[in-house]
Amino acid sequence: MRYVKSALFVVLAIYLPGIGDFPAAGAVPSQTSSPNEVSAQTESERAKLVGTYKLIGRETKDANGTWQSTPNFNSSGYITYSVTGYMGVHVMPNDRTPFTGAQPTAHEAKTALEGYTAYYGPFSPDEDADGKFVVHHRVGQINPGGEVDAKRFYDFASDRLILTPAAADGSKARATRRVLWERLPEVPLSDEAEQFVGFRQLLYTDRYTEREGRQVTHGQQNESRAGSYIIYTPTGHMMVHLMAQEGRTPYDGAIPTAEEALAAYRSFGGYFGRFTVHEGASPPYVVHHQEGHLRPRPNAPTDAERLYQLNGAILRLGGRPRMSNGETTGGHLYWEMLPARPE
């Protein structure tokens, strides 16, 4: 056991595993930058942000310009920044009402999205006259038409990270809300678990059918959600964002209608929590301890078990196979480690 010193790292729908090897992975490109591309200050600021943080509160500015704690704060979530230049966040209101059926009604979907934040992508620290800020380049998010480059001023207070969304004019002085996060410590991970740590993007999914130990069908690679993220961190946490590439229509207004919310819900999925790797099992598997989920769940965390194979930069995940009428069916998700971004 040893402490992880490497990068940080995001699955929703259950897919099932099959037999056979998966594609060999290429080497992950190393991080390179010339002296003209990066300043010592920028390097330092990225390093300062790197980590996984737990949501601990929100504040709003009153008429006198004083920051006040948000009354009845009751949300949970994590934000994580990697040394390779990527970030992800999930924030969920607590005490949500589960759906009455297997699929939500339009009204239930609208309620499920209220107060839920989830997005992912690269990040870039910078500075202007108002202070230091980080831009979250959101390549994926729940809101189909949400802001792509989200500017957040940041400050540190001991182990706390304070993120202040910029005002409409891009300033900090006119900002009226901020979010409080607490840095989490890294934990001892096994050598196998360390290989999970990092940010990966989805390449494709597949499905298969077997009969009497022989593969009778193997579906084509499905790339409809390619580019989604799965993240494993040195703190023992994970999160996943699964987003459809096509068919996501922006809302007509600032708040979605019930039908717009249902369409957004169907095209985006994700959860967050801790992870545990069982490399000694046969076959080996990883458990995603789901503390929060886009789909409202009962208060108790749900454990999602995923069989896995690691092959260089590629991580293959899938649920356990299902057997019915003499046939075994399953599927996989193939995730590739993202390369380090130049600073």
Regions found by a protein language model. Name each.
Residues A7-D21:
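Bacterial N-terminal signal peptides
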